Amino acid sequence: MKLLVVEDEALLRHHLYTRLGEQGHVVDAVPDAEEALYRVSEYHHDLAVIDLGLPGMSGLDLIRELRSQGKSFPILILTARGNWQDKVEGLAAGADDYVVKPFQFEELEARLNALLRRSSGFVQSTIEAGPLVLDLNRKQALVEEQPVALTAYEYRILEYLMRHHQQVVAKERLMEQLYPDDEERDANVIEVLVGRLRRKLEACGGFKPIDTVRGQGYLFTERCR
C-alpha cells in the first residue's frame, strides 16, 4: 500500500517512514501540508497519517482541503492533544480515526490495518474513458469490452496517464514511476513504450487518447471517471 505521512517532527517522521516501510508499505513522508498537497496531486495514495499540529496550514485544514478535492482515502490523525474536542473536530473535518501521542507503534499499525480493511471494499476498481476501461484489480485494459494485450510497463503508463487525465505529464515523471531506482535509464525508453501503447489502442477502433505536447510531455485527452 502507498501511505502518506504528514508529520513535522523529524525524528518521528523518520521513525514512521522506517517502521511502515518495514511492514511492506511504500511511504511518502513529508513535513507540512503544502508538500502533502503536492504529493497527492502527483501520486496515488491508499491512506494518510496526518499530525494536527503542523506548521503553516494546520492538519485540520489539510484534511478539509483533501476532502474538498475529492480525495477519499482513509485518514488517521496523529495528535498530542488528547481532549475530546480535538478528536471530534478531526473526525468532523473528514478523518476516519485518531491516535494520541505518545503511542506504541503496534497500536498505530493495528488502526492503520483496520482502516485499510474497511476501505478495501470502497476502492475504485475501474477507470473509464470513452470506450476504454481500465480494470485496476486485474491490471487489464479493455476497449469496447475487448482486452488489449499490454505489457506491464505499458499498463503502468496508461494507468498513470488516466489518473492524471487532461494534465500534461512529463517524461521524467513517467520515468520516476517505472524506474524509481534507476537514474541512468534513457528517457527515450518512455517514447518507445508510449508509441507501442498508442498503436495498440489505435488498433482497437482508432482510439487515440494520448497526445504529445512538444517539449513538455504527454496528455491523456479523454475525461476519465
Curated annotation (Swiss-Prot):
SMART domains: REC (SM00448), Trans_reg_C (SM00862). The gene is phoP. Disruption phenotype: Deletion leads to loss of expression of the outer-membrane protein OprH which is part of the response towards Mg(2+) starvation. GO terms for molecular function: phosphorelay response regulator activity; transcription cis-regulatory region binding. Pfam families: Response_reg, Trans_reg_C. The keyword Transit peptide does not apply. Gene3D superfamilies: 3.40.50.2300, 6.10.250.690, Winged helix-like DNA-binding domain superfamily/Winged helix DNA-binding domain. This is Two-component response regulator PhoP. Coiled coil: none annotated.
